[in-house]
From Swiss-Prot:
Highest classification ranks of the organism: Eukaryota, Metazoa, Chordata, Craniata, Vertebrata
Residues annotated as glycosylated: 34, 129, 159, 271
Gene Ontology cellular-component terms listed: extracellular region
Organism: Crotalus adamanteus (Eastern diamondback rattlesnake)
Subcellular location as annotated: Secreted
Enzyme active site: 172, 372
Family as reported in the entry's similarity comment: Belongs to the AB hydrolase superfamily. Lipase family.
Tissue-wise expression: Expressed by the venom gland.
Chief location category: secreted
Job description of the protein: In physiological conditions, is crucial for intracellular hydrolysis of cholesteryl esters and triglycerides that have been internalized via receptor-mediated endocytosis of lipoprotein particles. In venom, the biological contribution is unknown.
Protein name: Putative lysosomal acid lipase/cholesteryl ester hydrolase
Length: 400
C-alpha cells in the first residue's frame, strides 16, 4: 500500500512539474492542427479532398502538390500516394521537421504527394448512410480498406492529376492493404508504377509487442473491454496528456516509450521534442472489427479474409465455410521493401516468409537497428531510406 502511495505522489509530482514547465514554454501549435494546417504551417501548399468509396465511406485525402524546393510547374509532377498504418493517419508523413518527413521530402524532390486516411480514423469518420454512433459504421476491417478505400483513393488521384499510374508507399498496415488490393484487383494493380513497402506486414506468426499481446486475448474479452465500435481513437484525454504532460524531458521519455512498448525499441532515433505532436495525432483510431481481424491473424499465424465466426456467415460472405486466404502470388506490381532488424511487429521470420510470396520483388533492404516507427519518424530516415526511394522513383519515372 505504502509503495502505491509513494508512486502516486511521485507521479503527481512529475505531472505538476511538467504542467509548470508547459506553462512556461507554451503549447506547440501543431498539437491542435489538422493535417492540412500542419502542411501549411511548414510552408508547403496544401489541398484537401473528400473521396466516396464504393460502400459509402467518405475519406479525407490530403495533397502536397509541390514543394518549397521543387516549385509549381506547368508540367504535371509524378503522383505518389502514401498510406499510413494501423491506428495511424496521414499526419504520420508530415509530423517530423521538413527534411525528416517523407511527405515533404517527396514534394521537394519533384513529386505530387497524396496522403491517404483509412476509414474510421480521425479524419475519415463520415458515411453516406451511417454516423459513427451506429454500429453499422464500424463493421469493417483491413479487408474493406483494401477492397474499397485503396481503389477509391487511387482512382481519385489519377483522375485529378490526369495520370495513368502512380507510386504507392505503404507503412505497416498500409502495406497489408496494398498487398491485398493489388493481388485481388488486377485492374487496380496496373495503375501502380511501383509499390514501396515500409515495415511490411502480411503474416504475424512471429510478431511480438503490446499490440500482439492484445491480439492474443479471446474475441469475447476484446469485445467486453472495447465494445463493438471504435478502438483507440484520438480523444480529449489523449490530447490533454500529450499537450500538458508530454514535453518535459523525463515525461517525453515516458510518452515516447508508449510507442516503443507497442512496436520495438530504438529510442535514440526518435526526435523526443516532437513526441507531443505525434501523440496528439496518433493513435487515430480504427474499428474493433479491424482489431479482431488482426487478432485472428495473430492466433492463426496467417492473414486471411475476416472470419465471421460461423459456417453460415462465412458462406454468406465468401461462398465457402472458412475465410479464403489472400493469394500474394497474384500481386505482380514491382515491389521494393525496407525492413527493420528490431521491428517487433514486422519480425525477421515473418519477413522471410513474405519475401518468398512476392513474385516481382526487385529490392529489399534491412536496416538492422530500426524498429517499426523508424520508417516514419526516424532521425536517420533521410539518409538510410528516403534517398534510395527517391532515386528509385526517378529512375522508374524517367525510364517510361
Amino acid at each position: 500500500m505504502w509503495r502505491l502511495i509513494i508512486i502516486a505522489i511521485l507521479f503527481q509530482g512529475l505531472v505538476n512539474s511538467a504542467m509548470l514547465e508547459r506553462r512556461k514554454r507554451g503549447v506547440d501549435p501543431e498539437t491542435a492542427m489538422n493535417i492540412s494546417e500542419i502542411i501549411l504551417f511548414r510552408g508547403y501548399p496544401s489541398e484537401e479532398y473528400e473521396v466516396v468509396t464504393g460502400d459509402g465511406y467518405i475519406l479525407c485525402l490530403n495533397r502536397i502538390p509541390y514543394g518549397k524546393i521543387s516549385q509549381k510547374t506547368k508540367e504535371p509532377k509524378p503522383a505518389v500516394f502514401l498510406q499510413h498504418g494501423l491506428l495511424a493517419d496521414g499526419s504520420n508523413w508530415v509530423t517530423n521537421l521538413d527534411y525528416n518527413s517523407l511527405g515533404f521530402a517527396l514534394a521537394d524532390a519533384g513529386f505530387d504527394v497524396w496522403l491517404g486516411n483509412s476509414r474510421g480514423n480521425t479524419w475519415s469518420q463520415k458515411h453516406i448512410n451511417y454516423t459513427i454512433k451506429q454500429k453499422e459504421f464500424w463493421m469493417f476491417s483491413f479487408n474493406e480498406m483494401a477492397m474499397y478505400d485503396i481503389p477509391a483513393s487511387v482512382n481519385f488521384v489519377l483522375n485529378k492529376t490526369g495520370q495513368e499510374q502512380l507510386f504507392y508507399v505503404g507503412h505497416s498496415q498500409g502495406t497489408t492493404i496494398g498487398f491485398i488490393a493489388f493481388s485481388v484487383l488486377p485492374e487496380l494493380a496496373k495503375k501502380i508504377k511501383m509499390f514501396f513497402g515500409l515495415a511490411p506486414v502480411m503474416t504475424v506468426k512471429f510478431s511480438s509487442g503490446g499490440l500482439v499481446k492484445l491480439g492474443e486475448l479471446p474475441e469475447f474479452l476484446l469485445k467486453e473491454i472495447f465494445g463493438t465500435k471504435q478502438i483507440f481513437p484520438q480523444n480529449a484525454v489523449i490530447k490533454w496528456l500529450a499537450t500538458h504532460v508530454c514535453g518535459q524531458v523525463l515525461i517525453d521519455e515516458l510518452c515516447g516509450n508508449f510507442f516503443f512498448l507497442l512496436c520495438g525499441f530504438n529510442e535514440k532515433n526518435l526526435n523526443m521534442s516532437r513526441v507531443e505532436i505525434y501523440s496528439t495525432h496518433c493513435p487515430a483510431g480504427t474499428s474493433v472489427q479491424n482489431m479482431l481481424h488482426w487478432s485472428q491473424a495473430v492466433k492463426s499465424g496467417e492473414v486471411r479474409a475476416f472470419d465471421w465466426g460461423s459456417r453460415k456467415e462465412n458462406m454468406a460472405h465468401y461462398k465457402q465455410p472458412t475465410p479464403p486466404p489472400y493469394k500474394m502470388e497474384r500481386m505482380l506490381v514491382p515491389t521494393a521493401l525496407w525492413t527493420g532488424g528490431h521491428d517487433w511487429l514486422s519480425d525477421r521470420k515473418d519477413i522471410a516468409i513474405l519475401l518468398t510470396l512476392i513474385p516481382n520483388l526487385i529490392y529489399h533492404k534491412e536496416i538492422p537497428e530500426w524498429e517499426h516507427l523508424d520508417f516514419i519518424w526516424g532521425l536517420d530516415a533521410p539518409q538510410r531510406m528516403f534517398r534510395d526511394m527517391i532515386q528509385m522513383m526517378h529512375k522508374v519515372q524517367y525510364a517510361h
